[in-house]
Amino acid sequence: AVLDAGLICTASLPCPAEMTASLHINGTGSSVMDSILVCRADSTTKTPRRVSGAKLHDWLMKDRESLARGRITCTKGDLLCLGMGHLARVAIGKLRERWDSSLAFSEKAAIATNELAALVERAAYREVVEQVLEIELPDRELATAGVVLQGSLFD
């Protein structure tokens, strides 16, 4: 739908989802995060068209650290979800130039699926998620939690 509308994806943002209150998901390690894709019609905005394991690692660490400052601990399921959001953003950027919205839905779905699968492999998606999950966040990440909420932004 994003490509059919001629939009570009300028960001993928982590956001706690409504599943956080779901009793059957709570404590299972399943994702309770959503990836919010910020999309615009602006054709001048640069979007990433390449991804590496190192770049995906950086994106996921930034997400994890940001969420930790909000006192949210990421599970493997959360990181898998957030990583897929970043890869979807790259896939949209790569496919945008050659996208043919007149194709049948099944053809468009196959093209998008193949592009995403190639990015998953190229970025070593599952391995990167495991690496990010194993990194111990410094205590200072949690010590600064709530600073923004207590600062002048909301005064």
Locations of the language-model features?
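S-adenosyl-L-methionine-dependent nucleic acid methyltransferase catalytic domains
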Residues: 1-155
